[in-house]
Structure formats: C-alpha cells, structure tokens
Amino acid sequence: MGCRALLLLSFLLLGAATTIPPRLKTLGSPHLSASPTPDPAVARKYSVLYFEQKVDHFGFADMRTFKQRYLVADKHWQRNGGSILFYTGNEGDIVWFCNNTGFMWDVAEELKAMLVFAEHRYYGESLPFGQDSFKDSQHLNFLTSEQALADFAELIRHLEKTIPGAQGQPVIAIGGSYGGMLAAWFRMKYPHIVVGALAASAPIWQLDGMVPCGEFMKIVTNDFRKSGPYCSESIRKSWNVIDKLSGSGSGLQSLTNILHLCSPLTSEKIPTLKGWIAETWVNLAMVNYPYACNFLQPLPAWPIKEVCQYLKNPNVSDTVLLQNIFQALSVYYNYSGQAACLNISQTTTSSLGSMGWSFQACTEMVMPFCTNGIDDMFEPFLWDLEKYSNDCFNQWGVKPRPHWMTTMYGGKNISSHSNIIFSNGELDPWSGGGVTRDITDTLVAINIHDGAHHLDLRAHNAFDPSSVLLSRLLEVKHMKKWILDFYSNIQ
C-alpha cells in the first residue's frame, strides 16, 4: 500500500503564510500530476458501481440528482452472519482510498464482510454538476459533511434493498483522517444505520478552538526532536538564514544553487519557498512509517530519522546549514537520487481534490493553526480568523462558520453516543486534535505509540511495530462485539 495515499489532511495556504495555516490541503490537495496508479502488487478486485443521489437531501423543491461512485468487494462476504464494512470516503478519488486501506481487506475474511468504499460528493467522479461543480460558491453550496453523510445513509439503504442478504446485516463505518471524522459523525447522526465506527486519526477536536492552535506544530517538532538531538534546532535556525540570504540578488542566487532548485528564486518567491519547506517537515511527520514505502518518491523506513542524520549541528556556517537542509529535503523529494533539481511547487499528492477541500476549509472545516517559534521549530504565525475569513471570501465569496461543526456534532460533549473507536498514532500531528482518552466504555481511544497518520488502516507489514499490531487486534475485537450484539438483539 503506497504511502501516497495517507496524507489525508494537509494545509490550505490562503495567502503566503510560511507556517502553513490550515489548508488541509486536500489531501488531495497536494499537487502531483495525474491520478495515482496503484502498485499492481496491491491492486484490489472490486466492482465499480454508481448510485443516483439527490443534490440536496434537506430540501424538497430541488429535484436535481447526480451519480455517486462506489466500489464493492464481496469475496469473503457471507449472507448468513456476515457484516458490511463501509468506508466513508474523504477528500479524494475513492479508488485511491480503496487500494490504500489494506486493513479492511486484511480483516474482511475474519469478519465475513462485504467491503463498500463510497466516494465523497465533489471528489473523484462523484461531481454533482460535472465540470461546473467548482465553478462558484452556488455550485459548491452542497459540499458539506452533512450532505455527504446523507449520501452514505441513502447508499446503504439502497444496498440493503438491492443486494440479496444485505438487509439485516450490521454495517460498520471505517475512515481515516477527514474520512475518520465522517465515520465518527456517521455513527453519531445515523446510529440506526451503522452499528459502530472506526475513526482513525480523526481530529474531530481540531475545530472551533477545542484544542490549542499550536498543538499540531508542537507534535511535528517533537517528532524531529526525538529523532535527533539538534534536528529541530537546525530547522528553526534555517528560517533566519533564508531571510538573510534573500535580501540580495547574490543571496537569492546562492539559495537557488545550494538548495538545487529547478527555477531561480526571487524575493517574491521566498514565502513560497518557506511554505514548501515547512510543509515538507509536516508531511514527513505524517508519513513517518516504520518501513520503506513509496510516496512522491521512495521513502526509507522512519524517514525523519534519515532526515535528522543531516541536521546534527545548528551552529555550522550558513552555507553548510543550508546544504544540510538540502540533504534533508532530498530524503523526501529525491531519496532515489534520480531528480536533477527540487521543485518548490511539488508537495504531496494529486489524487485528492484541492479545490473541493479549499471550499470546505472555508465553510465548515475551520481548523485553527499557529506557531510561536519557541515550542515549535517554525516561524511565529498567529491564527487570525478575520484574515482567514476575508481570504476565504476573496477566493470563494463565502465566509466560514467556525462554530457550526460544534453545533452539528457536539464538540467534546459526545458522551451520549456509543460504539466508536478513536485511534491515533502518537507520532501523528493530527493526534493533537483527536480523542486520545476513553470517554465511556463504548467511546474508546486507542493510542499507537509508534504510529504516524492512521498507520492502523494500512495493510499488514512485516515491520509493523507491536503497538499497531495490538491496536488492530483491539479494533477487530470491538467490531466483533458490535456484530455479535447486533445479531443477539434481532433474535
């Protein structure tokens, strides 16, 4: 399962802030080139189907519809005593998530499960207005988590009616990152449709100021600090060195040469350069996996440790420090050694839709981020909701409603719900906005000591640490109980 699929939440660079205020870039957002091509060795067998959904589930006058894509794999499904594992698609092409959520495929036989992967509206092929879907805010008005959850509910009802044996089977929602948030909210809003949910790396408390805005970047910094004694200090010092050199034409040329950039730097590009570097450190924290895998380029096991091999001394000369930064960046962008230069427009992956997530980040999904340069290794950046709101209005003609998600889903007041697993990797910066303590006996937290961004949803690997192996066993244990309780209650 390629690492490319797992940056499910990145950042929305509205403006030129170098410390990356939220853009949960769409995970899809990241801009690679074309849609991802799965590794043939892990390609999955499934049927591609479409279901006609209402554009607006919450009004009666709008009769427009669109086709939602979904994937079904039923190799291990049993009509008697089986279950349905339902992936709540997030901000990207559903085929990508299908091919990169190996956990579901690994447990399908044990749970006698049909696998269903539902594409999120406005992503992949599930475009309500075709090529006009992102034309303006009027066309994007139906891109909300509430509408997406209603799509999932309607699709499950359709499956129960049209697949013999599906009706009367327990459905479990599974998702990671934004998809994990949706899985949790799906169980909260539609408990009569799904018996439980696995919400992996789901930062449901990153919203509405429920956690300190600097928590995310502190965790990123701690990942680097733990991987090398002077690693984070070297990165922190690099910002001033970049500023110093960018003040002259010769300095800009030196920066271009030392960092082996594909195009010459100008003073106007310095914020872009800094944002690109900062985003690289963030992405490394999310994909800090215990085995080698393929992201933009091949990545080694524990890539931050590899990065920190080059960042051992912050007190070297400016030129040497930048040369070390280049070597560190090359771990992420050129580990294979095949790239002739580094392109600062290249970030994460392209299979996710940046335009769709950009709109969501400007409406419902408002996640405050900040840095102070003391508790973290980034330049100071203050969260400014007014500026953020104005930037959103300039881009989309809408202003965010930062408190709406708390109103809709309860914020931290969710103890009345049940049967939700919140799993978080302690290395994952999104864990700062996740549920990391049990709320009740049935709202449980599983913390993965050596886990990065939803490592537990990845396919089994011989190099998996014991912490993720245990987490998966616990997750399956809870699911089996939900399934058993379901069948016990209908007898």
UniProtKB/Swiss-Prot annotation:
Q: Which SUPFAM superfamilies match?
A: alpha/beta-Hydrolases
Cellular component (GO) terms are:
basal part of cell; extracellular region; lysosome
EC assignment: the record states: 3.4.16.2
Enumerate the Gene Ontology biological process terms.
angiogenesis involved in wound healing; angiotensin maturation; energy homeostasis; glucose homeostasis; negative regulation of systemic arterial blood pressure; plasma kallikrein-kinin cascade; regulation of blood vessel endothelial cell migration; regulation of reactive oxygen species metabolic process
Please list the GO terms describing molecular function: metallocarboxypeptidase activity; serine-type carboxypeptidase activity
Q: Where in this protein does the record put region SKS domain?
A: 192-332
Function of the protein: Cleaves C-terminal amino acids linked to proline in peptides such as angiotensin II, III and des-Arg9-bradykinin. This cleavage occurs at acidic pH, but enzymatic activity is retained with some substrates at neutral pH.
The top of its lineage is:
Eukaryota, Metazoa, Chordata, Craniata, Vertebrata
Protein name, per record: Lysosomal Pro-X carboxypeptidase
Compartments where found: Lysosome
The active-site annotation reads 177 (charge relay system), 428 (charge relay system), 453 (charge relay system)
Residues bearing carbohydrate: 99, 315, 334, 343, 413
Family assignment? Belongs to the peptidase S28 family.
InterPro entries in UniProt: AB_hydrolase_fold (IPR029058), Peptidase_S28 (IPR008758), Ser_carbopepase_S28_SKS (IPR042269)
